[in-house]
Amino acid sequence: MATKLNKKDRLRQLKIEIDKNPFYTDDELAELFSVSVQTIRLDRMELGIPELRERIKNVAEENYHKVKAIVGSEIVGELIDLELGKSGISVFEPTPDMAFLKTKIIRGHYIYSQAESLAISVIDAEAALIGVANIKYKYPVRIGDRLVAKAEVIRKRGNKYFVWVMIKVKNKEVFRGKFILASLESDNTEKEVQ
């Protein structure tokens, strides 16, 4: 926003911006409106808009019931969008205990777990397993980074699903994976995955 708005206009515009993108941080909103973070927090409270973590949780709760292949609590991160058999988005904020002590870089298996659980979540099947994973860690993830993962089902052939997952931190790709998942029939889990 180029010019500072008066409070009434700022409150109206803040509501519009958060409705458009509920994942704005208070810092991002403060920068957008050229005010302090404290002002944004007070404005949010006045409008009855919860903090980011609560907004993400509310959106995620609406999506967990759609997942078939795993239980919602098994998903790494908050599932904020899901279209079964097509695509999904999750947000994950690693905690300090997930990082290496010396470098403060998040351990790779947490990043992979977010991608894997999202890939399994988008599959329109009662049970699914990763058969093949081709992954690439592109940049280190640090404490305080917010990971946004997007999964897309590229192709389905028989009981095989081809899913691409991209994870970004502030629009910078930090991880990508191409997964081949096999949906398992509930009465026969002995089938070969690949």
UniProtKB/Swiss-Prot annotation:
Q: Which cysteines are joined by disulfide bonds?
A: none
State what this protein does. Transcriptional factor involved in regulation of membrane lipid biosynthesis by repressing genes involved in fatty acid and phospholipid metabolism.
What is the protein's species of origin? Thermoanaerobacterium thermosaccharolyticum (strain ATCC 7956 / DSM 571 / NCIMB 9385 / NCA 3814 / NCTC 13789 / WDCM 00135 / 2032)
Keyword match Lipid metabolism: yes
Q: Which UniProt keywords apply?
A: DNA-binding, Fatty acid biosynthesis, Fatty acid metabolism, Lipid biosynthesis, Lipid metabolism, Repressor, Transcription, Transcription regulation
The reply to whether Lipid metabolism figures as a keyword in the UniProt entry is yes
* Xref: Gene3D superfamilies: Hotdog Thioesterase (3.10.129.10), Winged helix-like DNA-binding domain superfamily/Winged helix DNA-binding domain (1.10.10.10)
Which InterPro entries does UniProt cross-reference here?
HotDog_dom_sf, Thioestr_dom, Transcription_factor_FapR, WH-like_DNA-bd_sf
Task: Kindly list the GO molecular function terms attached to this UniProt entry.
Answer: DNA binding; DNA-binding transcription factor activity
One short Pfam name that applies is: 4HBT
What domain of life? Bacteria
UniProt similarity note? Belongs to the FapR family.
Record-level GO BP terms: fatty acid biosynthetic process; negative regulation of DNA-templated transcription; negative regulation of fatty acid biosynthetic process
The name under which this protein is listed is: Transcription factor FapR
